[in-house]
Amino acid sequence: MSKQADSLGFEQDAKPENVVWHRHAVDKAQRATLKQQRPAVLWFTGLSGAGKSTVAGALENRLAALGYHTYLLDGDNVRHGLCSDLGFSEQDRRENIRRIGELAKLMSDAGLIVLTAFISPHRAERQMVRDLLPNGEFLEVYVNTSLDVCEARDPKGLYKKARAGEIRQFTGIDSAYEAPLNPDIDLPAGEKSVDELVAQCLQALAERHIIQRWV
């Protein structure tokens, strides 16, 4: 049987068929029942500066106040740990989304309402994550803010650096952003307040029976 060394130096079987799935004694439905909620993944996508983290954070705060069990995965935060080994090449960006998708799936399996805030510029990558989850459990949330508004905000100074050529392949400037064609939730973040956007999200969750109480 062929062997290969992993990153820690341990020998592993090279063939993936030697890895089997271990079934849990407590399943997803039981975890969700204990939490009295329906698991879901809300995937916030949009340009840098669109307001993804702001709206997702405000929504999580509101859901927590209502007694729901949540977790917010933020694009910057995961690059301090889980994805700290990745850069910003197309390949690394895709791997970044793949890892977050798998993590979000595990958190959903734990019965949580998962919120993620990532630019995730390509439709194929967002579809890749949707395909990981049961039908109706992935909600694409488009934080719909124009490039002009995002660039005017420029909270991290990234657009200025991109325009100056200090950052290459920056989404919206010299790298394309593929806006969702039919998002589950379309947030006009350049026109409404954060509170209004949160209310829109809560209503959408209630309509899908993901939450029962939100007023």
Swiss-Prot record:
GO terms for biological process: hydrogen sulfide biosynthetic process; sulfate assimilation. This is Adenylyl-sulfate kinase. The active site is at S120 (phosphoserine intermediate). Keywords: ATP-binding, Kinase, Nucleotide-binding, Phosphoprotein, Transferase. Disulfide bonds: none annotated. It is an enzyme of class 2 (transferase). ATP binds at G46, L47, S48, G49, A50, G51, K52, S53.
